[in-house]
Amino acid sequence: MSAPLKDVPPTQFEQTLLIRCPPARVMAAFFDPAAIAVWWQAIRSVTTPRPLGIYAVEWEPTTERDDLLGRLGGVFHGTVMEYLPGRELFVADAWWLPPDDEPIGPMALEVSCMLEGASCRLRVRQSGFEDSLRWRRYYAVIARGWQSSLSSLKEHLER
């Protein structure tokens, strides 16, 4: 007998939300170091909005340890493969480098912005998966992180 779908750990993250501001401003928040520090709580970022640009974000290591992932924080980095100003970002060959453990990757990060009335429909998807407990735990943890960060992004941009 297979487990109910709700009990299956996620193998990617995807969320869509409506933000009351122009798409160009939403997309810009994924590249502006000051904005990234506010909504994503990053301590440092290097993000280049062009094909083959670097996309790297660093967080302070946590003091507590996850049983499977170790300390959280560390660096997420990849290569910008596609960038359409105000509309789309695609980062490939992305990896999470935790403070103390082995990297997790490769992954992809997709961000799209669509005008909807006077607002922006933001879609964020992070994918890439290896069938292991560590990967499943990673997606369970980042889902909470993304949800909190995207809520902060919305609040930051709607002020």
Model-derived features with residue positions:
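Hydrophobic/aromatic beta-strand elements that line small-molecule binding cavities or substrate pockets
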Residues: Q15-L17, S45, F76-E82, M107-L115
